[in-house]
Design a protein with these regions (language model features):
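Glycine-rich, basic loop-to-helix element that forms the pyrophosphate-binding segment
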Residues: 65-81, 102
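N-proximal low-complexity "stem/linker" segments adjacent to membrane-targeting elements
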Residues: 1-27
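Short aromatic/hydrophobic "clamp" motif used to bind/position activated sugar donors
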Residues: 86
Length: 328
């Protein structure tokens, strides 16, 4: 029998999509699975749906938390997991039927500690069902050493914890950082890198990512969006512990993150923008500090260079122009 895979599914108010997510996991061609659903203080019908799913499938376990955040929910799943392998699936997403089989075979054929696959986005259920009709040839995965993976995957945007399968022995005592609402995926991977020998990546699109209009990145700015800056500051320290040459590249990403946060603030109405003066001040001070890192500014595109210069010298004007351009 193949080893047990523990599938960890955190959910908060997921009544509209949790069942379809779980069905996609139960329909995997890899058949030795346990599914751990962490209901993180949902206030809708999610709890009742969890009970229904547990009664229907004998490989499901359910844990209830008190709205403690996705990091705590995932950590609870890791602590409970009995499998020799772990994977994470967000409750509004889906898996293709062969996803876990492809990831497991990638680990088996390469001797890697982690295997990842690509993802496809969808907005409506019919769109996802249509994508399932498209056949994809399964090719040999690319294999990276940790430093290569950092440079060629994580720093190029593949910083997600989902769409990956992990050996449980490698995860060990590594957990998701609590208190962050953005970027906890990337920091988990950064923590993991020193402990892995090799990582495999297949171009098989095994994961379906739901573009949720109510998702965190589509919500109005709150001070929690500053976590996007904090996580890249932490990531830089972790990356430089692995390879010091990454400083300028990550600082370039940090500069872009600061501008993305500033853009979120700019989308607010004028009265609400005025309430975020402290956040604007922090963004500007951090920007000025990071511009001193050699090579960071030069790594920006021309468009970002213009934005950075304007925000640095006239943040109020930048926010007003950005708002006008988006809403004219």
């Amino acid at each position: 029998m193949k080893p047990l895979i523990s599938v960890i599914v955190p959910v908060y108010n997921g009544q509209d999509y949790l069942e379809n997510c779980i069905i996609s996991i139960e329909n995997q061609t890899y058949d030795n699975l346990e599914i751990i659903i962490i209901n993180d203080g949902s206030t809708d019908r999610t709890g009742a749906i969890c009970v229904k799913l547990k009664e229907k499938y004998d490989n499901i376990r359910v844990v209830t938390l008190e709205d403690e955040g996705v990091s705590t929910a995932r950590n609870a799943g890791i602590d409970m997991a009995k499998g020799g392998f772990l994977t994470f699936v967000d409750a509004d997403d889906r898996l293709r039927p062969k996803a876990l089989e492809v990831l497991y075979d990638s680990i088996l054929s390469t001797g890697c500690d982690v295997a990842g696959c690509r993802f496809q986005t969808f907005r409506e259920e019919p769109e996802w069902q249509g994508q399932l009709l498209t056949l994809h040839r399964i090719k040999e995965p690319a294999v990276y050493k940790p430093v290569e993976y950092l440079k060629k995957e994580i720093l190029k945007g593949n910083s997600r914890c989902w769409s990956k399968l992990y050996r449980r022995s490698v995860v060990g005592n590594i957990r998701f950082q609590k208190g962050l609402s953005i970027g906890e995926d990337m920091l988990f991977l950064m923590e993991l890198l020193p402990y892995v020998k090799k990582i495999a990546e297949t171009d098989y699109p095994g994961y379906g990512y739901y573009q949720n209009p109510k998702g965190a990145m589509n919500r109005e700015f709150t001070p929690k969006y500053m976590d996007q800056i904090t996580c890249w500051e932490i990531a830089r320290d972790k990356a430089m512990a692995i390879d010091k040459s990454t400083e300028s590249e990550i600082t370039t990403i940090l500069l872009m993150s600061i501008m993305l946060v500033a853009g979120k603030i700019a989308l607010l109405s004028l009265p609400k923008r005025r309430q975020q003066r402290e956040s604007v001040r922090i963004c500007r001070e951090k920007l000025k500090k990071e511009l001193k890192v050699p090579g960071a500014y030069e790594g920006l595109s021309k468009g970002y260079r213009f934005k950075v210069r304007l925000f640095r010298t006239a943040p109020g004007l930048y926010l007003a122009l950005y708002h006008f351009r988006k809403y004219r």
